[in-house]
C-alpha cells in the first residue's frame, strides 16, 4: 500500500531527526519519481508517466475532500486523506484489473477459499 508506506516514511524521518518539517517534499519525490527511475532501469516500457507507449499503470481513488484541494496542497491530501482501501479502479499496462472494486482478471472467491484452506492446513501443521 503505497499510501501507508508514505505515511510511515513521513513519520520515521520526522521522528529520527526530531524535526516536524523533515522529509516533507522528499518522500513524495522518492515515491513518484525515485521509484519510476529505479523501475525504468529494469523494464522496457516507460513507467511512472502517462504518455503513448508507457505502461499505463493508473489507480482511481474515491476521495471527496472536506477542504479544497489544489496543486499547493495535493501532497497533504494524499498523505492525510487517502488510503489504499479507497482505490476503486486499477489499470496495469493499459488493462483494467479492477473496476468499481471488482477484480476482473481472476476468481477472487476461489483464491480466497484456497487461501483459507491453505491457512487452515498450515495452522494445523504448526499447532498439531
Roles of regions detected by a PLM:
Residues 8, 34, 93, 114-118:
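Residues within well-formed alpha-helices
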Residues 12-17, 83-87, 114-117, 122-124:
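Glycine-rich loops and low-complexity Gly/Arg-rich segments
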Residues 1-65, 79-83:
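His/Asp/Glu-enriched, well-ordered alpha-helical/loop segment
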Residues 32-35, 88, 108:
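Alpha-helical structural signal
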Residues 17-20, 38, 46, 89, ...:
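Secondary-structure transition/capping residues
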Residues 55-105, 112:
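C-terminal cap of metal-dependent C-N hydrolases
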Residues 101-128:
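Intein/HINT protein-splicing elements and their conserved insertion hotspots or analogous self-processing inserts
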Amino acid at each position: 500500500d503505497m499510501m501507508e508506506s508514505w505515511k510511515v516514511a513521513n513519520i520515521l524521518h520526522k521522528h529520527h531527526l526530531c524535526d516536524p518539517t523533515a522529509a516533507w517534499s522528499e518522500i513524495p519525490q522518492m515515491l513518484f519519481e525515485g521509484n519510476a527511475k529505479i523501475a525504468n532501469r529494469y523494464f522496457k516500457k516507460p513507467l511512472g508517466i502517462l504518455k503513448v507507449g508507457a505502461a499505463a499503470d493508473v489507480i482511481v481513488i474515491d476521495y471527496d475532500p472536506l477542504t479544497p484541494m489544489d496543486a499547493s496542497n495535493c501532497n497533504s491530501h494524499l498523505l492525510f486523506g487517502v488510503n489504499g482501501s479507497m482505490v476503486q479502479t486499477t489499470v496495469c499496462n493499459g488493462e483494467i484489473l479492477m473496476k468499481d472494486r471488482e477484480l476482473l482478471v481472476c476468481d477472487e472467491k476461489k483464491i480466497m477459499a484456497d487461501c483459507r484452506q491453505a491457512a487452515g492446513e498450515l495452522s494445523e501443521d504448526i499447532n498439531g
